Amino acid sequence: DEIEHDKKATLEFKWMLGVCYGNSIEKGVKPEDTTCDAHKGNAELTINPFDELSVRKIKYKADGSIYSDDADINKDVAETLNLNCQALSLPQTRKNVLMAEKNRIMRKCKGKSQDAFMRELERTYASLTQERNLTPYCGIIISWIESKLKIS
């Protein structure tokens, strides 16, 4: 993985952020098929990944695509970072990750009460948000759990 950091904190390494290669390792990949830092290049972002209020403006559609009602953040995710890249099937991958997590929770709670289901949602949510056990595409899982737990 590469390292991306806030230009204002160039020598403050605590502000560095790990980023993916964004489909840039393969030879012959078209620029429009790159994502994340590879697609962003030197463009500045409006969204601040260190600011929870900024990140909370990111939303997910049922098909797994990512967007924001904030026009600048939507431009960041859709254009600058190309996070709905069809060449990499990013929306479908997000949707698949969410379906797998829903299935895991349903299997674990099968035959149990609604309270057990809610406790499993709370446990999973705490694992992701408080314990920071973050996994690829976990944003869509967090968003779904928040909708179920009515967290905004």
Residue ranges and their predicted role:
Residues 19-30, 66-69, 73-74, 146-152:
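Short, surface-exposed, charge-dense and proline/glycine-enriched linear segments
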Residues 12-22, 58-64, 139-143:
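Short, Lys/Arg-enriched charge-dense amphipathic segments
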Residues 74-152:
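C-terminal, charged low-complexity interaction regions
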Residues 1-41:
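Histidine-centered nuclease catalytic patch
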Residues 18, 54, 101:
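Functionally constrained cores in energy, signaling, and assembly domains
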Residues 29-75, 83-91:
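Long, low-complexity, intrinsically disordered segments enriched in glycines and aromatic residues
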